[in-house]
Amino acid sequence: MPTLDRQDNVFVLDLGDGENRFHPDWIASVDAALDEVDKAGGPRALVTAATGKFYSNGLDLEWLSAHARQHEDYSASVQALFARVLSLPVITVTAVQGHAFGAGAMLSLAHDFRVMRADRGYWCLPEVDINRPFVPGMAALVQARLTPQAAHEAMLTGRRYGGTDAAAAGIVDRAVAEDAVRATAVEIARAQAGKAGGTLGTIKARMYSRVLAALRGATPQG
């Protein structure tokens, strides 16, 4: 399960050491950690990272299959998490050390900056290959955080991007060696910790007002 640590002005949220799928308990744990970051006050920034082969493998399809009647509530909770990260009044940096697929890839896009391992691991939106159309909020998030060309290719082809290719496409900001992923993310976050506060939160809310409205208000479909 996710754990939260603090290194001076930088909170580090480790999403876990498994596939880190979006199980309801996992979502609740991440949301509780974000509550702590939000309420902390003072200079601060957030890094999200993970341990092992996966950053996040996306939706918990096994749980969803067993709880089909909760489909809409589940989808709404996933979109609410994206909106929470996107609008958090601190600078957020994600350290993608392993595979980021589907909702895991979208979670990375909700952060302000992204660092990815250069030599192994893929960033991928496989929805087109698994017959799960993007709901409006998720589509809006991807299109707001990527260039039109990158969003078009990622969404329509399901391409698997390695770190170097992801950096070239603007999906991530930096691709670095395995042992530098988390440290680089912390370095970026620490340099921007002084920006935390209401002004930053207002800028984000206005910059992404349409995306946030779609994530919070769209009827979940998948």
Language model regions located:
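Conserved CoA-thioester-binding segment of acyl-CoA-metabolizing enzymes
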Residues: 1-49
